[in-house]
Amino acid sequence: MNCIKQFLLAICFSLALTCQDHVLVGGTTTRDIIVPKISEWQVTVVNGLTTGETLFIHCKSKEDDLGEINLKFRNRFSWNFGENMLHSTFFWCYMNKDNGHMNVNVFWDDVILFHRCGWKNCIWTAKTDGLYLWNSASGEDVLSRKWEVGW
């Protein structure tokens, strides 16, 4: 009996996916409710070091190595991705400047981070005293982590 229920549920779900897509209030569609879209995100790292020095960054996830980047003052590096269905997408970066370095998480599944990033765009700015995250809710950069001394 359990197998029959699962089979019928699978058929109903398949039919729902193939049914005509109706647009609801606010642009949401019936298909969006049945199969929610995977969130699209952008992470940006900005060199805001007022000393004019170059910022070295190396960002990666479990699946993707984004390479080593040397960012000149006021330049930025961005990447786009879709959050996976298990909500385990995770990016981190190693950053280095003349007299400091850090390993820092720049994207992970966290509702507070999502709120600060405006549910789509996390902007990290390296400044002389540390790394700041743009809080879109408050409209200001918030110090997230201070530089570790040395290389």
UniProtKB/Swiss-Prot annotation:
Expression across tissues: Restricted to floral tissues.
Highest taxon above the source species: Eukaryota
Disulfide pattern: none
Keyword Zinc-finger applies: no
GO cellular component: extracellular region
BP-aspect Gene Ontology terms: pollen-pistil interaction; rejection of self pollen
Signal peptide: 1-18
Alphabetical keyword list: Secreted, Self-incompatibility, Signal
Cell location: Secreted
Family: Belongs to the plant self-incompatibility (S1) protein family.
Protein name as it appears in the record: S-protein homolog 1
Organism, scientific name: Arabidopsis thaliana (Mouse-ear cress)
Protein's gene: SPH1
